[in-house]
Amino acid sequence: MTSQPLRLAEEYGPSPGESELAVNPFDGLPFSSRYYELLKQRQALPIWAARFTFLEQLESNPTGVVLVSGEPGSGKSTQIPQWCAEFALARGFQKGQVTVTQPYPLAARSLALRVADEMDLTLGHEVGYSIPQEDCTGPNTLLRFCWDRLLLQEVASTRGTGAWGVLVLDEAQERSVASDSLQGLLQDARLEKLPGDLRVVVVTDPALEPKLRAFWGNPPIVHIPREPGERPSPIYWDTIPPDRVEAACQAVLELCRKELPGDVLVFLPSEEEISLCCESLSREVESLLLQGLPPRVLPLHPDCGRAVQAVYEDMDARKVVVTHWLADFSFSLPSIQHVIDSGLELRSVYNPRIRAEFQVLRPISKCQAEARRLRARGFPPGSCLCLYPKSFLELEAPPLPQPRVCEENLSSLVLLLKRRQIAEPGECHFLDQPAPEALMQALEDLDYLAALDDDGDLSDLGVILSEFPLAPELAKALLASCEFDCVDEMLTLAAMLTAAPGFTRPPLSAEEAALRRALEHTDGDHSSLIQVYEAFIQSGADEAWCQARGLNWAALCQAHKLRGELLELMQRIELPLSLPAFGSEQNRRDLQKALVSGYFLKVARDTDGTGNYLLLTHKHVAQLSSYCCYRSRRAPARPPPWVLYHNFTISKDNCLSIVSEIQPQMLVELAPPYFLSNLPPSESRDLLNQLREGMADSTAGSKSSSAQEFRDPCVLQ
């Protein structure tokens, strides 16, 4: 027997004035007047016309897969999850909860807040969300919004299996690694432990629909009608401006002077430019002679945290939201009437050959450009100012966003695929197959970390590494700290390296710079991060204390939560802990050993004593980042001869970030012998081999001496 679609409140009969008679089927409480207000808004969305079609396809489709195709702003991300919850409720939630993935944690939280409001339910009870360091769910949660990378971690581990009745993969056109991987795993039918009657809903922009249709084998597609009304005609500049931030600011100020109605959405390539634009606009708008209140300038990027909800608040003043690719498809803002688009994005692209990230400034895709333009549609249509010529978009922009699985370090993904007992990650289906070189580099790195056994399967150590929500090399360093009795410090460091950057970018005032410099540690950036965290905790996690030192309060709070999660995980899998000893000479050496155990692939040597570092694994020369503690000292000493680094970024300056001095003897002692043998020919490799031979001779001599001492007493006896 097929279940019937759940009836909405107004289908039960009472009018809004009699709402006390209508009961919310999810919690058994009467609907509030707020529910009916929001229901009218929901029914006005373009997607509402497809409600019953979608529920019928979800119920009757034998393959269990439904595609939903619609433009940004059509209501896909808020309504599809609610309809899936109705479907699951009609079946008594016997197959599990409804889980909705989002490519960005901020989007998952924001949608959960909105959907809980529309459903007249309590956030954290029937509707919840799971994002890094924040699990706002409970035992009665029926609808959960989740960062897609967290869900991939759940799928790969033994935890959480069997919890999903409907799985919604939203914003598939974003092409995140986790979203593409989840689709590959589901399409390959490798999730045997999941419920057999699982429903999968893939929600996408129309531009990716043909590719998804072919990938899933022509499943039923629910097309969302286009929103009525005129679409703005883009206004193109003749040339690309030399200063994007200044051009965007002047365009916003011109709109404000004309006092055209509606909010403004500005797209810039990077968070740094977003901050500069917000600072400049906040100063300039105060001097405008306007009839009403000056515009409110709001940033929108991943580091905004909970402050992102300000973009949805009703204000008497005009809102100017400054963002980047984060808002291409997420965060629909109905009040937007004007869009200013730089046409560019700044992305990190990983090069597996040299194990480095490139900061690439590139054109957005045609799909993104169209999504940005549609933000300004309405009655009457708004405006879309493109800070680039039309030929730039036509000739240089790709049709779709680049798949991130072709641009990121795949070591963590391969580790998770191995956890799912997929012997050859290259055999897993992806919408776009990763480069063989990237997969080989990931396998090689995992092999160096002892995460794989002789057959190429996960070793016991690899299974433990896959449990941690950390990069494999950082998880290895954390496990090594158990051996070297520095777990407390390594927990702090792992959290600080994984959370958002704890330092705000200069310029700082002289007073702020002096206070920040006082937090630097002589042993290097890694110890400085530990010292910053401990000072933050001692301050009582005070936000004003952070602001006075140019520290990111939200990032430090995130690190504190993550540290607690890591500690709980180590206790659960019964790993040994150690007491705090930060600052002692022994702890300094132990911490270096733990770091080298995980990061021996990221070592560089100063070749000429001036700070030109040759990377050990390939012949690239880099300098220390300008934010490195070794460079920010007032009287810098000679650069450290050997350093371990966290990141190597190729941009304007090839730079090493988060750097600490190490002794090459530690590298010889702790790195796998075959790793040293595989290094490219260089003076650094020769020095390490000489050290290894000397240490081997010393060890042999020590053993010989010990044996002689043992034999002599035996003779005397």
From Swiss-Prot:
Region (Disordered): 694-717
Annotated function: Might be involved in RNA metabolism; it is missing helicase motif III and may not have helicase activity.
SMART domains named among the record's database cross-references: DEXDc, HA2
Subcellular location: Nucleus
One GO location term (cellular component): spliceosomal complex
Domain Helicase ATP-binding as annotated: residue spans: 57-225
Major subcellular site: nucleus
Keyword annotations of the record: ATP-binding, Nucleotide-binding, Nucleus
Xref: PROSITE patterns: HELICASE_ATP_BIND_1 (PS51192), HELICASE_CTER (PS51194)
Compositional bias annotation for Polar residues: 699-708
Residues annotated as binding ATP: G70, E71, P72, G73, S74, G75, K76, S77
Location of the Helicase C-terminal domain: 248-447
Motif DEAQ box, residue numbers: 170-173
Single GO molecular function: ATP hydrolysis activity
Protein name: ATP-dependent RNA helicase homolog DQX1
Gene3D superfamilies assigned: 1.20.120.1080, P-loop containing nucleotide triphosphate hydrolases (3.40.50.300)
